[in-house]
Structures are given as C-alpha cells and as structure tokens.
Amino acid sequence: GGSCGQCRVEVHSGGGDILPTEEGHINKREAKSGCRLACQVAVKQDMEIEVEDEIFGVQQWECEVISNDNQATFIKELKLQIPNGESVPFKAGGYIQIEAPAHHVKYKDFDIDEQYKGDWNHFGFFDVESKVDEPTLRAYSMANYPEEEGIIMLNVRIATPPPGRLHLPAGKMSSFIFSLKEGDKVTISGPFGEFFAKETDNEMVFIGGGAGMAPMRSHIFDQLKRLQSKRKMSFWYGARSKREMFYEDDYNGLAADNDNFQWHVALSDPQPEDNWEGMTGFIHNVLFEEYLKDHEAPEDCEY
C-alpha cells in the first residue's frame, strides 16, 4: 500500500501522525492541513475525515479486453469493453483504477509487435518474469474522450527492470497489463480525476511525452470534437525517435480540420533511418525556445 498516492483524504481528528510511506505523496503543507493516504491510516479511535464528493459516485466494472496492441516499443494501447448498457461517466483528463490479481507473468509470453522485438531482445527483457503475491491497484488516465462510448482506452508504458539489472522487480501492474490478451477480463473502478479543462477562452498548451499521451488525447479530442472549441490550442509532444511516435494520423486530421489547433513533435534521439528534419531535444525545452520565449503572454495560457 501507499504506492499510487490516489486515496487522499482530509483527516480532521484522529489518525495519528503522517507515516514515512506517505511522505513521497504528501508535502509538509498538505500534511499540516490533515491530508493523508486512506490506505495508510489505521483506525484505532474515533475519527473525523473528509473525502471528495466524487468518491461517492465511484463504481466498479468487469471489462473485457478488446485489444492490447503496441503503439511504441514499450507502450501498449489497452482497449477495454464496458459491459453492455453501462457507461463510465468520466470527464476528459480523468482516470480509472485497474485491479490486478496475484499473478505470475513471463515476458516471453507477451504479444510484442515484430518491429519492436529487436529492442526487447537487445535488453534481454523476454527473460524477465513478474511474480506478485497479492492484488494490486494502479491508476491510469483515459486516452479516449467521453463520446467514445462503451470503451476505456489506456496508454501503458511497461516498467521493466533497468537494463543489466534484470534481477530487480518489474512493474507489478504494467507487467500484468502487457500480459493481457483479447477476451481477458479486467476489473476497473472510477471515475476519478481533477485534471480537467477550465471553461474559459484562454489559449491551451498541451505538453506530453511517452505514455503521457493519454490525457492529452482525451482533452484535445474532447475540446475539438465534442465541444467544437474555437480556443487557440497547441500540442507539444516528445518522443525518442520516429518509431516511438503514435496517433500521428489522429492529430494530423485534427490539425487539418481545425484552424485553431496545431501539433508539434520533437525527437530526443532521432535515428539515421528517421531522416528527421523536425525539432530535436526535450519537449519542454523545445516548447520554450520555439514558442513560449517569444509569446506575448505565456502566463495567460492554460497548461
């Protein structure tokens, strides 16, 4: 427990002092106001706590895996089917929690697209195994937006052991997710979230990299497709090389159909075969140098 940091509550009385397992998720100011992780608070006396209203709307669903395909070398798009007649009433930028039972998975059994197997072999990752003796819970942002109904779509990056140190534990949940195949059953709960767009006319600047694509896609699709927003917006995405880029067709289509939207990619390690003539470097630096440095009012943008 205490690893995901998602079960925050306000403890007004009782509960004792904050534990070391909470300090990585709760700063001193938050701790002073009574913020705690519910999973770490032992109930030994009468307590007064406050939880966010949204918690009372949380539900649980048993979903079925529709697909679980590579989008990049170490990123999969997990698409889940919600039970017929039901829906997850989430907002763009929201997240769900996904449950994994105790399990023992072998990386050699993963379905990895042929174009990515070279890197997996190079680092010896197909020799890795992940054994988990108790149920595990983790949070993932939705990549789909609310009008993509009946499904939940996640972008999941696998947390492998560091290359050359394969004896170290692999990511419990990401290893489980990479092992999922079409037709498998998965339990999720939600919706949760606070990373929501404000209802203003301010310019929107989206910044992401890797599996951080998920909430960006949800937000941008929601703004342009559901809300048909005319706000000026741009998406700045960072990838290692051209092979690690994904959803290109989606964003190219949005840019073609919406004059108020642009998207930009910077590669941090372009390969010779990429023949890349675009921007290079880390995306936060590129955003500053190429745009925000000369922006007339960057403080007015919503990020």
From Swiss-Prot:
Top class in the EC scheme: translocase
Catalytic activity: a ubiquinone + n Na(+)(in) + NADH + H(+) = a ubiquinol + n Na(+)(out) + NAD(+)
EC numbers: 7.2.1.1
Domain of life: Bacteria
Keyword flag Membrane: yes
Record flagged with keyword Methyltransferase: no
Region (Catalytic): 201-303
Localization (cell): Cell inner membrane
UniProt GO cellular component terms: plasma membrane
GO biological process, one term: sodium ion transport
UniProt domain 2Fe-2S ferredoxin-type: residue ranges: 1-45
UniProt GO MF annotations: 2 iron, 2 sulfur cluster binding; metal ion binding; oxidoreductase activity, acting on NAD(P)H, quinone or similar compound as acceptor
Cofactor field: [2Fe-2S] cluster; FAD
Keywords: 2Fe-2S, Cell inner membrane, Cell membrane, FAD, Flavoprotein, Ion transport, Iron, Iron-sulfur, Membrane, Metal-binding, NAD, Sodium, Sodium transport, Translocase, Transport, Ubiquinone
Record text on subunit structure and interactions: Composed of six subunits; NqrA, NqrB, NqrC, NqrD, NqrE and NqrF.
Function: NQR complex catalyzes the reduction of ubiquinone-1 to ubiquinol by two successive reactions, coupled with the transport of Na(+) ions from the cytoplasm to the periplasm. The first step is catalyzed by NqrF, which accepts electrons from NADH and reduces ubiquinone-1 to ubisemiquinone by a one-electron transfer pathway.
Protein name: Na(+)-translocating NADH-quinone reductase subunit F
Gene (name only): nqrF
